[in-house]
Curated annotation (Swiss-Prot):
It is a lipid-anchor; GPI-anchor. It comes from Drosophila willistoni. Expressed in mushroom body (at protein level); overlaps with expression of Sh/shaker and nicotinic acetylcholine receptor (nAChR) components also involved in sleep regulation. Expressed in the adult brain and head. Enriched in the mushroom body, anterior optic tubercle, superior protocerebrum, antennal nerve and visual projection neuron fibers projecting into the lobula plate of the optic lobe. The lineage of its organism: Eukaryota, Metazoa, Ecdysozoa, Arthropoda, Hexapoda. This is UPAR/Ly6 domain-containing protein qvr. Disulfide bonds join C42-C76, C45-C53, C72-C94, C109-C120, C122-C127.
Amino acid sequence: MSLPAGNAVGNWLLILTAIFGFLTLIWIPQASAECQTRSIYCYECDSWTDARCKDPFNYTALPRDQPPLMTCNGCCVKMVRHQRSRYEVVRRMCTSQLQINLFMVDHVCMMESSGNGHMCFCEEDMCNSSKNLYTKNGYQHLINIMIIWLIGILLNQLSNR
């Protein structure tokens, strides 16, 4: 395939950017706009009263040796207070137990203004067992945007020749 010369390269750049942008928008729903309505399982515990709830979480332990699971019609939540101190408290639960009026997005964490804690949301079975709720899929969007940006630079350089 040969590239057209001059102004047509700019048109190709615009078309390719639109195609990749559209494909990226198709992939973004994987991050779900709001907590889902289907039922998932979330861990329900507080490290203040249950040492099994602490990080690092032992997700390889037998189910009887893990904190209880509950059915959740929303997102799983993991809250950490007094992060990286001997007073650290980890709480794992479902959004149905929170009175929160925020637009919640899957695999999003909100930090305390002091930087000593955070609250993360996720929507897969037992996802609130993770130390870090960001998944590889969360970084996929950044990688896609970087690829689109690099292709745009390459096409721009080709059009300037």
